[in-house]
């Protein structure tokens, strides 16, 4: 059994094997003849992962080998309100994150402004936006509509389908009325609007599936590519599809809420020998009856094969 420390060590070693040393990587980049030239774009057969950093939002844009695309998270929150903990809004504060992200996507996307999939990993504002910090407030369908995160990006991008952890009932494993209330109200309004006016499909994320997030254009040409859904709503799935509920014992006490981070959606993208793991802010922990500390990251380490790892919380802590 691999513990969390071992898992993170393996992930770090994989990354280090690719990049060696951060300073050395920068040196390599400085010597690269392509530096400063226009980006050549995506080519068929490439699996590209674009980590989009704005300082106030988690966001990732993925281009599958056949050209299928996905925007994973697109948030916004009041960075200045964090005081001494505030970080700069990038590339500058003239625009909100949703617009910056959509501008970037339109530049690198082989389909320009059309994105096949969008996914909110969990209901926190820095991953999806909220109704308290926004670029603009409008009246749509007789009620307030806030352009923040995904809803702002959707003003510039067209999404074909959304994957969500608990749509349409918003009660898996508990009703989204406590910890995630702000982001929940925002995303529900966004989903309702997109269903009514933009013909976007919405589908609940299916834990354990390996074909839900599928290539849409030429899947048979790339049999070595797959996306395996490994965590959702406090549960994890191994390669055989066996599901373990990490919160099963805690549910017996009839709690009113769980940590939203622990509900994060997670996947392993596989392309040949390359594997990439990402799972929003997947993290939580509590003391067991025997006095030992249980961390859900330890549990997911058992179902994650050696892979390049990207999680928002780990990036901030290291």
Where are the regions a protein language model picked out?
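Secretory targeting signals
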Residues: 1-2
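N-terminal export signals
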Residues: 6-30
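Flexible, acidic/histidine-containing loops and adjacent segments that form or flank the divalent-metal
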Residues: 28-48, 54, 104, 112, ...
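N-terminal cofactor/phosphate-binding cores enriched in small/glycine residues
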Residues: 59
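Active-site beta-strand-loop-beta-strand hairpin of nuclease catalytic cores
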Residues: 66-69, 274
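Acidic/histidine-rich helix-loop elements
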Residues: 74-98, 132-142, 289-293
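Histidine-centered catalytic micro-motifs
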Residues: 118-128, 314
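Conserved small/polar residues in nucleotide/adenosyl-binding loops
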Residues: 311-318
